[in-house]
Amino acid sequence: MQNAFTIDQLPLSWQEQLKTEWSQPYMHKLREFLQSEYSQTTVFPAKDNIFTALKSTPFDSVRVVILGQDPYPGEGQAHGLSFSVPQGVRLPPSLINIFRELQTDLGIENTTGCLQSWADQGVLLLNTVLTVRAGTPFSHAGQGWEQFTDAIVTKLIENRSHVIFVLWGNAARKKCDLLFHSSHKHAILTAPHPSPLAAHRGFFGCSHFSKINYLLKKLNKPMINWKLP
């Protein structure tokens, strides 16, 4: 576990922003917890994929943040990017709804669930909790990940400008309470969660994908190509 959970796993830009977190007491406890969990039970994602979101989207490249909750708990689903699944894996219900809204909004139809190309374009696909015990949603909540991802969000709020934060659901909104005091620096898009339980309460019809590209165009930044390869 040790090699997979060191700061040198991250791009240099994230190392610079998060280096003080690695020495915090909560991180020491989190490392011990993860070492125990990975050695005694099945945990997702694989150790090498825990920090895929940060590896894929360096700090200075972040243009959009889409916050998730915790990884998918099913075999072969989680690979370190929120809402995403590896190539060839059946689409989970929330991702089906995300793609449904994308098609309604921009006429783009995606059939593969791997969102890596979004991450490569500057969309940080970050879960609030980065690991989960197999078959048990939220099983790694309250172990320290929330503090770590709070630090990620805080660094973006404080040290970057004109980032578009996409908050789907109450958990994401609560996570970004700080944003509502710094909205002059950043853009905020909110909607209900895309899960089947909530999507009909306002996620469908939110038009977030076109709104993101409209905001990027206003900032003279390249728009996101939402069509997956």
Curated annotation (Swiss-Prot):
CDD domains, A to Z: UDG-F1-like (cd10027)
UniProt keyword list: Cytoplasm, DNA damage, DNA repair, Hydrolase
GO MF terms held by the record: uracil DNA N-glycosylase activity
UniProt keyword Cytoplasm, yes or no: yes
Major place of residence: cytoplasm
EC number annotated for this UniProt entry: 3.2.2.27
NCBIfam families xref list: PRK05254.1-1, PRK05254.1-2, PRK05254.1-4, PRK05254.1-5, ung
Protein's UniProt name: Uracil-DNA glycosylase
Native organism taxonomy: Bacteria, Pseudomonadati, Chlamydiota, Chlamydiia, Chlamydiales
